[in-house]
Amino acid sequence: MTTDLTDRRQLILKLAIQEFIESSQPVASELLVRKYRLNVSPATVRNELAALEELGYLTHLHTSAGRVPTDAGYRYFVENLMDRTPLSATEQRTIRHQFYQVRSELDQWIQLAGAVLARTAQNASVVTPPRAQQARLKHLELISIHDTTALMVLVLHDGTIRQQTLTLDMALSQEELSRRASRINERCADAPVERVEEFLKQERAHEPPGGDALACQVLDLIVKAMHQFNEHLNSDIHSDGLIEILNQPEFSQVERVRRMIEILQSRRALGTLIPRALSSSGVQVVIGGEHSYDEMREYSVVLSRYGGGEIVGVLGVIGPTRMAYPRAISAVRYISAVMSDLLAELYGIEGDTHWEVES
């Protein structure tokens, strides 16, 4: 929705959304005039609220005369109206200190990021480990174990190692195995799964029928391992903050609690958001009905990738659409910067963010 709003309507929409986020109660014109000392009458504000409802930014509940924001209203607020409210300098120093205390333990980074995000944004959090954006073949070795038995050692770009014992059709020396591995390395080094699949297709087309049996066997295993890696990339999600999100009034009903637990545990819906965050720069905000999964349409998600180059992860918060967006966005932005700088410092992974104190 790109409707231009007058300055007065923008102000009233901003105040109405801020008030609803803070109180969780439908917002009436009298309250806005009284609390924010507006220099207009309640009747004027009431007319403006009605106009904003006609434009699709607000709606009202049948049991109340007050208005509540729609998804379109929240979107307009996030893109045009909200004030940027960075974390305080004290909060930033505390967060940075916490991460430095565990800087050599990657698993603890992930747990700490989830806990700090949830506590800071007062919502549930999601974090994925830093990985290659997609599997790429770094190196292959074939090691002779016995006459007709070999060990395949596959190393992916992020350091992931896969091992598989192979049964050979004929006895092959270590020299011959190394030659076959070198040929695959030459053709597929730094290749994504699509290129490996293309090479496998070419091998199968060669004489003798079916091509080089060992090469095809090895390439087929590589393709399967890379597909598994890519699938795991979108499902390896650490979540935290269930206690924080259950403090929100939206979760006073048991059914909504059950649905939220299901979302955090199943990973299916959240997993669809990971590729979007990985392929985008900056903080991404997905609000309510913008989600492709129906079960996510009562919630908003604020996500950002962290890291740099090929090695990246995603972190963010999930909560009701009545989310304190400025706070959530600042928390996600700052913690992603901290994580990026840690990766750059410890692993030489260049990120595009730094630990400068936001102000």
From Swiss-Prot:
Negative regulator of class I heat shock genes (grpE-dnaK-dnaJ and groELS operons). Prevents heat-shock induction of these operons. The keyword Repressor applies. GO terms for molecular function: DNA binding. HAMAP family: HrcA (MF_00081). SUPFAM superfamilies: GAF domain-like, Winged helix' DNA-binding domain. The keyword Transcription regulation applies. NCBIfam families: hrcA. It comes from the Bacteria. InterPro entries: GAF-like_dom_sf (IPR029016), HrcA (IPR002571), HrcA_C (IPR021153), WH-like_DNA-bd_sf (IPR036388), WH_DNA-bd_sf (IPR036390), WHTH_transcript_rep_HrcA_IDD (IPR023120). It comes from Roseiflexus castenholzii (strain DSM 13941 / HLO8). This is Heat-inducible transcription repressor HrcA. PANTHER family: HEAT-INDUCIBLE TRANSCRIPTION REPRESSOR HRCA. Pfam families: HrcA. Belongs to the HrcA family. Gene3D superfamilies: 3.30.450.40, Heat-inducible transcription repressor hrca homolog, domain 3 (3.30.390.60), Winged helix-like DNA-binding domain superfamily/Winged helix DNA-binding domain (1.10.10.10). Keywords: Repressor, Stress response, Transcription, Transcription regulation. GO terms for biological process: negative regulation of DNA-templated transcription.
